[in-house]
């Protein structure tokens, strides 16, 4: 199992080879396994951010007992979430599906109170689970993924590269917006009738994922 972890602070990507039974990189005290994070994606390549895992560590430590993770990482080509879902970027977790309503409400309140997540979905929108994510960057469309350009790195570049591959463009999945990703993006934009400047803004994201 190949795992890429992006660090928002250092702007670097680390690569790990792990088994499903191993702990996720940066997970402490066996809080989150590779199997739990990969979920039903069935992917042999997954990605996340260091800050996502560290936030889960703090959250789990404060809660003081195991937190069930029903859904986390997913490949955009498999779907199952909204078009610009943070699950595809590896920065989101849907948790607490096994708790009673009262216990889930307590955990939800803790998630809000700790202020360690970028977004905690309103509980009325997720009555049977809690959605938390550690998204980063200013969204190109007001919500969703940030604008990307040459030399961008990280989780959202992985999503871009996967969608380009799904459109039959020859790009590697490495999380780095290099020359091949730039060429593929420009060619896609040209074919889609968009401004082919290689900048992945709102219109390009919507064309790619919606």
Spans of features found by a protein language model:
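Cell-envelope/glycan interface and biosynthesis
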Residues: 6, 10-126, 130-136
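Short, basic alpha-helical nucleic acid-contact segments in DNA-binding proteins
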Residues: 190-191, 210
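Catalytic cores and adjacent binding grooves of peptidoglycan-active enzymes
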Residues: 4-6, 83-92, 97-167, 171, ...
């Amino acid at each position: 199992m190949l795992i890429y972890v992006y660090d928002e602070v250092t702007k670097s990507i680390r690569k790990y080879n792990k088994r499903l039974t191993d702990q996720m990189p940066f997970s402490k005290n066996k809080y989150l396994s590779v199997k739990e994070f990969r979920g039903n994606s069935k992917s042999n390549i997954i990605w996340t951010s260091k800050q996502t895992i560290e936030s889960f560590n703090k959250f789990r430590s404060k809660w003081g007992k195991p937190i069930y993770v029903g859904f986390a990482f997913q490949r955009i080509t498999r779907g199952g979430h909204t078009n610009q879902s943070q699950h595809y970027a590896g920065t989101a977790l849907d948790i607490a599906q096994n708790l009673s309503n009262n216990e889930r409400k307590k955990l939800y309140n803790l998630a809000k109170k700790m202020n360690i997540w970028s977004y905690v979905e309103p509980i009325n929108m997720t009555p049977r689970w809690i959605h938390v994510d550690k998204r980063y960057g200013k969204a190109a469309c007001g919500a969703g993924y940030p604008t990307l350009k040459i030399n961008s790195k990280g989780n959202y570049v992985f999503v871009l590269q996967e969608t380009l591959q799904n459109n039959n463009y020859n790009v590697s999945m490495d999380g780095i917006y290099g020359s091949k990703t730039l060429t593929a993006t420009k060619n896609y934009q040209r074919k889609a009738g968009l401004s082919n400047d290689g900048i992945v803004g709102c219109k390009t994201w919507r064309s790619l994922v919606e």
